[in-house]
Amino acid sequence: MKQVLGIMSCTLLLAACAATSEQEEPTATAVLQPRSGSQVQGTVKFTQIGDIVRLSGEITGHTKGPKGFHIHEKGDCSDPKAMSAGGHFNPHKGKHGGPYDPVKHAGDIGNLVFNDQGVAKVNITVGNISVSRDGPDGIIGRALVVHMDPDDLKTDPTGNAGGRAACGVIG
């Protein structure tokens, strides 16, 4: 019996050590609030996984179809039209582009597609940003914006994505 208890104690101790030695993945969240008179809102979580960042969440209240989705340079959504968020996050001074273009703004995520009920499920991976405040690609303290219209993935500097339907600070 003592031997069984000893083995169980060692097993629990090893399990506890393994659990505490695992490094947690950096995460951040943006809570999107309506802007420009829209009803668009939602929550997006950012999770750093190695060199990529996974965006996951749900956004509601938009019209059906694709809508521009970008990280903006300033973490300020105070303006009623979210113009206080500045332009697209662009630390490397690239041209506007699509999410898979080799040269683009770091904040060019592409389009979200909203269904008939006005809901978009977010499940995107991005490779040119980091969930941190440090370094040129850090996104904490910046803004996440959903636009009124589709991003054409080419027109500089905005992709003709229209007004800003929702904005949230990444933190």
Show the residue positions of the predicted features.
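Positively charged n-region of N-terminal signal peptides that target proteins for export
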Residues: 1-4
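Bacterial N-terminal signal peptides
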Residues: 6-15
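N-terminal leader/targeting pre-sequences
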Residues: 15-66, 71-171
